[in-house]
Amino acid sequence: MAPSKARSSPAVERRDRLTLAKLASYDDVATDALVDRAYFWTNTRKNRTKYIPVRGIMDDKVAEILLHHVIVAKDTVKAERELLAISGIKKYMAKLPSDREKEWFRRHLRKYIQMYLPDCPFEVTTTNRYTITEHEAAICARKFIKQGQEIKYLSGTLVPMTREEEQDLDLKRKDFSIVMSSRRKTPSFFLGPARFANHDCDANGRLVTRGSEGMQVVATRDIEIGEEITVSYGEDYFGIDNCECLCLTCERAVRNGWAPQVDSEASSTASTPALNDETKSAHGSTSPQKRKYAPDADSDASASPTPQKRRKFSRQYSKLRTEVSLSGDVTAIEPDPEQNTKIAVETTTDVPKDKPATNGVTENESNARVSENQRATSDREPSSPLGVDESQNSSASTAPTSLFDVGIKLEESTEAFTQETLTTTKAGSVADSHGDGDCRQLTAGIEQEALSELSESLELDDKSGTVVKRRKRRTRRQVVPSVEDESHRVRVPGDYTKTSKLLAQSYDRWVECRTCKTWFLQHNSYLTRRECPRCERHSMLYGFQWPKTDKDGPLDDEERVMDHRTVHRFLYPEEEARISRRDRGVSFGVTPTPELSEPRTETEDSEACDERRNTRASRRRTQSLRMTM
């Protein structure tokens, strides 16, 4: 029989397939080179926590390759070859072990190169709607997109995930690109340009699969120029029914995460169960989570609701160990020779006597013998240092671990107990020391482990072998950093734009873009910039004013600016004189979001100050809102 053809082992196939770690590494380098180093005003979120930017990648070099080979010549193959020749990317490619991995990296890099083609209908921008102090990546349309049209170049790569990889991403808060495959019913990790699309309850895009490893975005309705391209992450992704969602649709409707908080709810937060960790909103101060699939049924059954704020853990001791304080000063009490002190011992264990106890001895008899020994000792020593209080026997179900757990308060005394009685072999007995050295056994049957379970106010002195008061040790209180999320701050629609919370320095100011008419924060605004970072970056890359990327036709005589350094990026002195620096652009009481603001009319005379830039209706609305604050 001819031998069958040898198949490759599963280990080799597993080693050759595209894994999550490999795809995450490719995406980090690609976004670092083609997004962050292409005149981008911030750094995009990386998949690896300890990612170090690749050295040897210069912004001017990347922008030159994109301008000449991608934007003007529309030759992505040559642009890819030029980018791979950059020293930083070349060193990274040399570290890849196999040719197959190098091909995977080139294929993923090509997706980001195609974003800069003139016919690409979108571009990467940022928004601080979800986290006010940090800008998250977003996708903005720069061309009109029809309903049902597949958004060109807005794609990504899918890679299957294991359960261990999924849990690791949850711990690192990097689970913002997890999608659930409707066909295979397994989680997959999704990376590429389309991963920058944010969630919206009324999304204008939809994620669809293309092949086994591809993902594309299709427009579900008409998308206008300047509108953010969004997709839906799921019905219960940001809490139950997305109750913590901070999308633009919820902001306009003032619902979910934008809903006003009622005072009665604030007082009952301690008794109100909070959502599970997996359903917490990613739009808060922590890292955003995106496209996270709904948890399994078994995980929901095991999870229990936790309070909004976890109470500080405190160890609760049994009441049997608590001391019963005597009335008055214990040291001032003189023992009455006519009335002897009684000690009631509650125990459920057999107490051995001087002679070995038989099986017929009951628990009551053993307790009676112990009481007789204690009474005889008390009669012989009227001036015993023990000051005790009468106590009654409780039920047999309550078993203290020590004689000192029943309310005995001891004073410091070197005559209390001797070292000899503490070194018994199996059962330790507590003996009372007499003046002439005569020791009589007080109790027996308490094992040696019980000696370590003394009352909290007592301890064993190793030198003298006596039980003395425990000295209070001075402990330095250390502040333990909290691992819990802070309580969610109440969000108000438009609180992320024209707010004073982002004005960290004296010359920081909110400025209105002269191109797209949106407000942006300019740091150190000694001279006012003409355009926002998005429009300025577009002009530096394409040589045209946003959103234009190429000539409209043969009749278009506007020339492309090949050197962005020749463009004046600030306002001229006569324009600067008409700008009011009052309040540094901060808005009080008016929602400054462009989509929510009322339409306004502008004239040449209305540019004297910011207050005159609104219509009469807007001024009336401003006054009414200020009166209600």
Swiss-Prot record:
An annotated Gene Ontology molecular function:
histone H4K20 trimethyltransferase activity
Instruction: State the Gene Ontology BP annotations.
Output: methylation
**Catalytic reaction list:** L-lysyl(20)-[histone H4] + 3 S-adenosyl-L-methionine = N(6),N(6),N(6)-trimethyl-L-lysyl(20)-[histone H4] + 3 S-adenosyl-L-homocysteine + 3 H(+)
Q: Name one Pfam family in it.
A: SET
Top enzyme class? transferase
Domain SET span(s) in chain numbering: 120-234
- The source's domain of life comes to Eukaryota
Biased segments, Basic and acidic residues type:
597-614
Q: Which GO terms describe its cellular component?
A: chromosome; nucleus
Q: Where in the cell is it found?
A: Nucleus; Chromosome
Which stretches does the entry tag as region Disordered?
264-400, 586-629
Which UniProt key words apply to this protein? Chromatin regulator, Chromosome, Methyltransferase, Nucleus, S-adenosyl-L-methionine, Transferase
Stated role: Histone methyltransferase that trimethylates 'Lys-20' of histone H4 to form H4K20me3.
What protein family is recorded?
Belongs to the class V-like SAM-binding methyltransferase superfamily. Histone-lysine methyltransferase family. Suvar4-20 subfamily.
UniProt name for this protein: Histone-lysine N-methyltransferase set9
Organism whose genome encodes this protein: Aspergillus terreus (strain NIH 2624 / FGSC A1156)
- From the UniProt record, report the name of the gene that encodes this protein: set9
